[in-house]
């Protein structure tokens, strides 16, 4: 699509979203567009520090978890000693960026609003790790905590998965992986999905939206995919193109959140319509005036805080 034909997104977003877009961090250098992936990861971590400030304090523990690929770092957020369930959180970042620090505030707020233990899994990034390594690491971490639940004093009888953007894909893919391979890690009570991608290769929103402001041009999306997948055949895997999986049965209750001006919005709409058509428990909510990744900005955006509360409320309602 010719860029001039796209919607003038920055003129259409909400006032609070514009405030975020126009917020400058004077001590921060410009984005290293031509830098190495290591430099871009470092920048992303530095840039997110401002947005992570002021998060709720709670008991926090870090553990290294064994997987067949090596040790994976996890971080537990425990808002109360008697948690009714455990939520595994998978951060976004296009499979190539992000870590437990970049999404710290999101995980803390989710733990606070749900009063459930939240476990962030620092899966290995791409291109160092190729599909399906991240999913296998997530599943290994779930199995580890299920087996060691008493030692770590966590409730693994009921669990959930949550994630934003690429992390949303990983969240749902991990839940489907456990179902399909009949791996018991506790009952999956719900899956919380904020503005994820689930397998579409083209859509109306991908044509009309996406630009330098969100890093989601068609070229950007292709770059993330090429970094994540091992080969062309992986594009059709039911754990990458989730629409190629069986979404007609035994899908855990899904909270599906969409951002109005997100090029990935049609992925969320299609996922919701597919699940609803087959009587799978799900809820879709569109957040007006928002861009992709708005969940990070709860320091300034009431809508971001609302979206986290909505997800937490959906999850606790399933318990």
Swiss-Prot record:
Predominant place of localization: cytoplasm
Transmembrane intervals: none
A Pfam match: Abhydrolase_3
Enzyme Commission number, as recorded: 3.1.1.-
Residues forming coiled coils: none
Residues forming the catalytic site: 165, 262, 292
Enzyme class: hydrolase
Molecular function per GO: carboxylic ester hydrolase activity
Matches recorded under SUPFAM superfamilies: alpha/beta-Hydrolases
GO cellular component labels: cytoplasm
Keywords linked to the UniProt accession: Cytoplasm, Hydrolase, Serine esterase
Motif extent (Involved in the stabilization of the negatively charged intermediate by the formation of the oxyanion hole): 91-93
Cell compartment(s), UniProt: Cytoplasm
NCBIfam families: PRK10162.1
Similarity annotation: Belongs to the 'GDXG' lipolytic enzyme family.
Oligomeric and partner information: Homodimer. Interacts with MalT and MelA.
Primary role: Displays esterase activity towards short chain fatty esters (acyl chain length of up to 8 carbons). Able to hydrolyze triacetylglycerol (triacetin) and tributyrylglycerol (tributyrin), but not trioleylglycerol (triolein) or cholesterol oleate. Negatively regulates MalT activity by antagonizing maltotriose binding. Inhibits MelA galactosidase activity.
Protein's name in the database: Acetyl esterase
Source species taxonomy: Bacteria, Pseudomonadati, Pseudomonadota, Gammaproteobacteria, Enterobacterales
């Amino acid at each position: 699509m010719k860029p001039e034909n796209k919607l003038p997104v920055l003129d259409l977003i909400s006032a609070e979203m514009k405030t975020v877009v126009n917020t400058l961090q004077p001590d921060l250098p410009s984005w290293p567009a031509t830098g190495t992936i290591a430099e871009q990861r470092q920048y992303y971590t530095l840039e997110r520090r401002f947005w992570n400030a002021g998060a709720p304090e709670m008991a926090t523990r870090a553990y290294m978890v064994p997987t067949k690929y090596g040790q994976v770092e996890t971080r537990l957020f425990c808002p109360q000693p008697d948690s009714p369930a455990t939520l595994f959180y998978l951060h976004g970042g296009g499979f190539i960026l992000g870590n437990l620090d970049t999404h710290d505030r999101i995980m803390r707020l989710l733990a606070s609003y749900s009063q459930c233990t939240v476990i962030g899994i620092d899966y290995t990034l791409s291109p160092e790790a190729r599909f399906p390594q991240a999913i296998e690491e997530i599943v290994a971490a779930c199995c580890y905590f299920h087996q060691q639940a008493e030692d770590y004093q966590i409730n693994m009888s009921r669990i959930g998965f949550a994630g934003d953007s690429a992390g949303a894909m990983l969240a749902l893919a991990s839940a489907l992986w456990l179902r399909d391979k009949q791996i018991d890690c506790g009952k999956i009570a719900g899956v919380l999905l904020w503005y994820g991608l689930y397998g579409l290769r083209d859509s109306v929103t991908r044509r009309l939206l996406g630009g330098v402001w969100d890093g989601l041009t068609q070229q950007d999306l292709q770059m993330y995919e090429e970094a994540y997948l091992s080969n062309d055949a992986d594009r059709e895997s039911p754990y990458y193109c989730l629409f190629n999986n069986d979404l007609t049965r035994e899908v855990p209750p899904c909270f599906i959140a969409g951002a109005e001006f997100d090029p990935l919005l049609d992925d969320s709409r299609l996922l919701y319509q597919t699940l609803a058509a087959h009587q799978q428990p799900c809820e879709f909510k569109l957040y007006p005036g928002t861009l992709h990744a708005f969940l990070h900005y709860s320091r300034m955006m009431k809508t971001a805080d609302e979206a986290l509360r909505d997800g937490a409320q959906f999850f606790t309602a399933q318990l």
